[in-house]
UniProtKB/Swiss-Prot annotation:
InterPro entries: Aldolase_TIM (IPR013785), Thiazole_synthase_ThiG (IPR033983), ThiG (IPR008867). It comes from Bacteroides fragilis (strain ATCC 25285 / DSM 2151 / CCUG 4856 / JCM 11019 / LMG 10263 / NCTC 9343 / Onslow / VPI 2553 / EN-2). Catalyzes the rearrangement of 1-deoxy-D-xylulose 5-phosphate (DXP) to produce the thiazole phosphate moiety of thiamine. Sulfur is provided by the thiocarboxylate moiety of the carrier protein ThiS. In vitro, sulfur can be provided by H(2)S. This is Thiazole synthase. It is found in: Cytoplasm. Keywords: Cytoplasm, Schiff base, Thiamine biosynthesis, Transferase. The gene is thiG.
Length: 258
């Protein structure tokens, strides 16, 4: 499996993990390690910025993991830039998952403010990974603005409904000159495998692992699914038949006359 490269950094794993909704920090840490991930997102609002010994961070920080603070909770570009600067100071990284969703019910990203914030943050030296609508035009604009990746949603956050935006994701992947990370809505390992088979660069998963009966085993399942999907994509999937006419894999029938 080819390595994933984002902003010059190589990643062996193409599975990114979120850290919300776990029943305990211990379950979270063990799930992170079981998944093999090298990219972990953490919402700034969940971290005690005043404490240098926040218990949650102790379970996330590992030498092989790129910490990716996110701006979940901000409502516009101005708030996002402010939050990003706080995150850079607190976490010592210029990597940022940009999330702007002013509607607290559906948590859908604001496309206008996301593009505006991306332009500003890139100028300030941030490595910006924006969570966005599965809009091919917007994703191309974010790429042109300097985003390190685009992170279009598969379905609304936390719904576990899979790739509801599949047709748009296919266009985004086809047109992209930067990695495409499918984010939000992935509820089963099969969803992740499907995204990777389409050519997605990576998947970000949180809820499906965190609320599973056994998060550690589910993390392992997602690891295997992402690897299988990516390997299948790199190997070259066979074309699907048109219509419903079967085609035998062993069509020779001469032996019947022997």
């Amino acid at each position: 499996m080819e390595k994933l490269i984002i902003a010059g950094r190589e990643f062996n794993s193409r599975l990114f993990l979120g850290t919300g909704k776990f029943s305990s920090n211990e379950w979270m840490e063990q799930s992170i390690l079981a998944s093999g991930t090298e990219m972990v997102t953490v919402a700034m609002k969940r971290v005690d910025m005043e404490s240098t010994e926040d218990d949650m961070l102790k379970h996330i920080v590992h030498p092989h993991i790129q910490l990716l603070p996110n701006t979940s909770g901000v409502r516009n570009a101005e708030e996002a830039v402010f939050a990003a600067q706080m995150a850079r100071e607190a976490f010592g990284t210029n990597w940022l998952k940009l999330e702007i969703h002013p509607d607290p019910r559906y948590l859908l990203p604001d496309s206008v403010e996301t593009l505006k914030a991306t332009e500003e943050l890139v100028k300030l030296g941030f490595v910006v990974l924006p969570y966005c609508q599965a809009d091919p035009v917007l994703c191309k604009q974010l790429e042109e603005a300097g985003a390190a990746t685009v992170m279009p949603l598969g379905a609304p956050i936390g719904t576990n409904k899979g790739l509801q935006t599949k047709e748009f994701l296919q266009i985004i992947i086809e047109q992209a000159g930067i990695p495409v990370v499918v984010d939000a809505g992935i509820g089963a390992p099969s969803h992740a495998a499907e995204a990777m088979e389409m050519g997605a660069s990576a998947c970000l998963v949180n809820t499906a692992i965190a609320v599973a009966g056994n998060p550690i085993e589910m993390a392992k399942a997602f690891k295997q699914a992402v690897e299988a999907g990516r390997t299948a994509y790199e190997a070259g999937l066979g074309m699907q038949a048109i219509g419903f006419v079967a085609e035998a894999s062993s069509p020779l029938t001469a032996f019947l006359n022997e």
